[in-house]
């Protein structure tokens, strides 16, 4: 996994307070200073990127609550593509809201088959307003959600590889690639 994020937060050493817990029982092993880099609260955000992934890898652009309070943990998924969903002329692009620990949100995430070559540059964006999200690819609306997180969020860009998923004929040395041309944000609308 390789990921860039625009904010960072951890609780005290040995606490269970921190960002993006991927399983129960995790504890802070190393405190980090809190960093609120680019953490918008509403507005328009876009990333122009391209990726080369295999069936065992994926790439994503999402926004996550900084989790300074457990309930500020929802996510806005602007683009999530698993390599196994890529065909010659299309891919399934996941968009929506992930509830996680935010009781004010409902899980509302889906993958849409889009005619797209993800190895070419495309602009993935979201217009984020109170109670509303509108997702776009290259300026075309691909989805809407009638809810939204109501707190600052950090941006996250990541490429993930899952070697254990490699097929018998797959090149085990293949390295996924995510290239970002720009990240752009317009503050609160």
Predicted regions and their residues:
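GH16 jelly-roll
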Residues: 1-189
């Amino acid at each position: 996994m390789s990921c860039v994020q625009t904010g960072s937060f951890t609780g005290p050493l040995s606490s269970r307070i921190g960002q993006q817990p991927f399983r129960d029982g995790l504890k802070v092993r190393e405190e980090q200073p809190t960093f609120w880099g680019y953490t918008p609260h509403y507005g328009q955000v876009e990333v122009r990127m391209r990726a080369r992934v295999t069936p065992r890898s994926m790439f994503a652009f999402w926004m996550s609550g900084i989790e300074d309070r457990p309930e500020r943990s929802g996510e806005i998924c602007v683009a999530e593509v698993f390599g196994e969903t890529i065909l010659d002329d299309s891919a399934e692009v996941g968009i929506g809201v992930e509830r996680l620990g935010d009781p004010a949100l409902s899980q509302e995430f889906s993958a849409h088959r889009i005619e797209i070559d993800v190895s070419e540059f495309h602009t993935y964006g979201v217009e984020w307003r109170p109670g509303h999200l509108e997702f776009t690819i290259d300026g075309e609306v691909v989805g809407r959600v009638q809810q939204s997180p109501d707190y600052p969020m950090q941006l996250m860009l990541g490429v993930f590889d899952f070697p254990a998923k490699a097929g018998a004929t797959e090149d085990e040395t293949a390295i996924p690639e995510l290239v970002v041309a720009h990240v752009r944000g317009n503050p609160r609308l």
